[in-house]
Amino acid sequence: MPKPNHSTAPLPFPILIGDIGGTNARFSILTDAYAEPKQFPNVRTADFATIDEAIQQGVLDKTAVQPRSAILAVAGPINDDEIPLTNCDWVVRPKTMIEGLGMEDVLVVNDFEAQALAVAALSDENRERIGEATGDMIASRVVLGPGTGLGVGGLVHAQHSWIPVPGEGGHVDLGPRSKRDYQIFPHIETIEGRVSAEQILCGRGLVNLYHAICVVDGIQPTMKDPADITSHALAGSDKAAVETVSLFATYLGRVAGDMAMVFMARGGVYLSGGISQKILPALRRPEFRLAFEDKAPHTALLRTIPTYVVTHPLAALAGLSSYARMPANFGVSTEGRRWRR
């Protein structure tokens, strides 16, 4: 019977690496510490009843390599042997996975823990700087990722080690500040009476914001797809869409600035995920950095902190692979999150 194990010993190769999001799951296999990961096609979570089926059909049936262990990054808190995902119907059951998929060792981490691991050593070719602040200090960092939800992860640098800090920062309160905000926010769809950052700063949140703007302006909303809203906004072909993406960038800047202060992220704030890349033209405009820096009495501090958009197509897998190769470089907690045969 597989048992929880708090060992910090390296996981045995070959290692299955998985980034399990609300909509898509991405997998690779790392055969040894020096090899490049073997990538597999993305898997839509809605296409499989369980994660075990997705791994079997999407990975194991397509390779002769049998992984001995797995590191999985999941969207949701990890509290026990059954790990439900926040934005999809899968439940990760490491004990069942070990018995059913022939593995010896499974480690489960938060998805933005994996994103945080990635930004420890992200090259310039895999990131785009937003704003004038520069520098690449060996100092704490933070990652925010608007996608199916809003993920937040910290990366603290201490004792010559990178320590990822998972959490549910996407669910902090987000409130109105400007006159326009006070017009719009009463029409934002709430969750149990509150507006969290994730109610606006994700795909469905973008639609939520667009619909609220339409209500305030007495316009009939014509779009229900986040991609339609962003494309019309960037083309300048729909006034409500343009304002939606502009305010999205502003609110993202506010939350990013808050997280920069929480983690004292002098090493930079990184925006990951597909939405950040798609709205890059909007993030390059002044609104994002102005909101990021508008943190009196600490405006001067925020002006020194660089902000980046992560452009690496598989950043979470890259971060997990870095940890799998050199676990001693990272302070990853395994307590309550690692199971061995």
From Swiss-Prot:
One of its GO terms (biological process) is glycolytic process. InterPro entries: ATPase_NBD, Bacterial_glucokinase, Glucokinase. It catalyses: D-glucose + ATP = D-glucose 6-phosphate + ADP + H(+). GO terms for cellular component: cytosol. GO terms for molecular function: ATP binding; D-glucose binding; glucokinase activity. Keywords: ATP-binding, Cytoplasm, Glycolysis, Kinase, Nucleotide-binding, Transferase. Its main location: cytoplasm. Coiled coil: none annotated. CDD domains: ASKHA_NBD_GLK. ATP binds at residues 18-23. The keyword Ion transport does not apply. Its EC number is 2.7.1.2. It is an enzyme of class 2 (transferase). Belongs to the bacterial glucokinase family. This is Glucokinase. It comes from Rhizobium leguminosarum bv. trifolii (strain WSM2304). The gene is glk.
